[in-house]
């Protein structure tokens, strides 16, 4: 299993830059558009839950659940970028993830941040 299955992030040539910082070195914020978010809820897969339960008894990484969470975060990020792009932003500053259990049936992942327009200094 490669890094692409267990990692995430943004493509190098993305038209909407997403950062976890307040600013981007070499750029200035010319317009703050406001909060944007991308949200997804994934249901639990019974097979993964049984496997995770057994694995947790003997220890080790729960690779099936890890892969699902990575996919879920990546989908939330894609939706965040779509929202920012639709509002005319070319950057999302101060991006964060929030992960919550959703009524014992799944996991809610929200990627959120501040949509902005930035330009080179």
UniProtKB/Swiss-Prot annotation:
Q: Which Pfam families match?
A: YbjQ_1
Domain of life per record: Bacteria
Please give the family membership noted in the entry. Belongs to the UPF0145 family.
> What's the protein name?
UPF0145 protein SGR_4080
Species of origin reads: Streptomyces griseus subsp. griseus (strain JCM 4626 / CBS 651.72 / NBRC 13350 / KCC S-0626 / ISP 5235)
From the broadest rank down, the organism's phylogenetic lineage runs: Bacteria, Bacillati, Actinomycetota, Actinomycetes, Kitasatosporales
């Amino acid at each position: 299993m490669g890094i692409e299955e267990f990692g995430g992030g943004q493509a190098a040539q993305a038209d909407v830059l997403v950062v976890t910082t307040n600013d981007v070195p070499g750029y200035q914020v010319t317009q703050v558009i406001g909060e944007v978010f991308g949200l997804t809820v994934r249901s639990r897969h019974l097979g993964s839950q049984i496997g995770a339960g057994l694995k947790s008894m003997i220890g080790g990484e729960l690779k099936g659940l890890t892969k699902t969470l990575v996919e879920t975060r990546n989908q939330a990020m894609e939706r965040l970028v779509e929202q920012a792009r639709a509002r005319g932003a070319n950057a999302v500053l101060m991006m964060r993830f929030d992960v919550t259990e959703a009524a014992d049936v799944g996991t809610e992942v929200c990627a959120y941040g501040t949509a902005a327009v930035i330009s080179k200094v």
